Amino acid sequence: MNTKEIECRFLEIDVEALKKRLAEVGAKDEGELLLDEAIIYDPELKWRDEERFLRIRKSGDKSTTLTYKEHSTHTVDGTYELELNIDYFEKAKLLFEKIGLPFFRHNQKRRHKFKLDGVTIDIDTWPMIPTYVELEGESEEALKKVAEMLDLDWKDADFHNARWMIENKYNIPVSTFRHFTFEKCE
């Protein structure tokens, strides 16, 4: 079981040009979903400062996952992730609330997923920021290969987590928000 996430992002992409390139290189289009997420920190919010959290994610009507994430470094493989499938989004939120870990923030994003040569390519659209693409795979070499196939320059790859990027590149204090959704950002 691989618990290290190997991923990078390319920010402020031309979505239509990227989709065209994905089709040209034969990437498999796995569709677009709205992702609903409940982000959970410890009651003292130490986890937030330590860049770790629990996430309950509902992917449209397809699946629900519970994930523990810990960002140790801002590198291609600097994230530890442990994820499992669960059945009930709302019941999971209630369970954590009952044990003293209520959800802190509700996130939403739209994700258009593709697969190419074993690499997952996610075109992510969040509220308030430009759309970006995330590549995730088994190795840095695999990501570099797919980035090259998609005409993405590796020197432009960003290895920060989404929260860091939203706060530091776009000056949106998302870690203080209770809602970061398409209907409400506060």
Language model features by range: what are they?
Residues D124-I129:
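A contiguous pocket-lining binding segment that forms or flanks enzyme active sites
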Residues M1-T120, K155-E186:
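N-terminal strand-loop-strand beta-hairpin
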Residues K144-K155:
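Long, well-ordered alpha-helical scaffolding segments within enzyme catalytic domains
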